[in-house]
Amino acid sequence: MARVKRGVIARARHKKVLKQAKGYYGARSRVYRVAVQAVTKAGQYAYRDRRNKKRQFRQLWIVRINAAARQNGLSYSRFINGLKKASIEIDRKILADIAVHDQNGFAALVEKAKGAL
């Protein structure tokens, strides 16, 4: 059997991890052993927060829709119920965008929702 020396592979792996840790503070960006831990933890946070981002944006949209609906004299839950009864299928992302950028259009939606209740 031929002897296998892993210097090139180990160096490449170290370089890869240290490149991923670029910009981290102190030893986290310089020391391989610490950088591995930092990069692994960063990956866990990224994985978790890609899922949390969806929840947080939905919460934000609901807050914006609720605020705009209450300005027009209707609570969020009654507004959504009215839209469903009026068979208006607009998702919360678009409703929030309309609420922020087109108050008159949102007021018209609120009136349709009130009429359907």
From Swiss-Prot:
* Gene3D superfamilies named in the record: 6.10.160.10, Ribosomal protein L20
Arranged from A to Z, the UniProt key words for this protein are: Ribonucleoprotein, Ribosomal protein, RNA-binding, rRNA-binding
Superkingdom to which the source organism belongs? Bacteria
The Gene Ontology biological process terms listed for this entry are: ribosomal large subunit assembly; translation
- Tell me the PROSITE patterns matching this sequence: RIBOSOMAL_L20
Can you name one GO molecular function term for this protein? structural constituent of ribosome
Q: Name one GO cellular component term.
A: ribonucleoprotein complex
Task performed by this protein = Binds directly to 23S ribosomal RNA and is necessary for the in vitro assembly process of the 50S ribosomal subunit. It is not involved in the protein synthesizing functions of that subunit.
**Family per similarity comment:** Belongs to the bacterial ribosomal protein bL20 family.
NCBIfam families (UniProt xref): rplT_bact
HAMAP family, from UniProt?
A: Ribosomal_bL20
Q: What is this protein called?
A: Large ribosomal subunit protein bL20
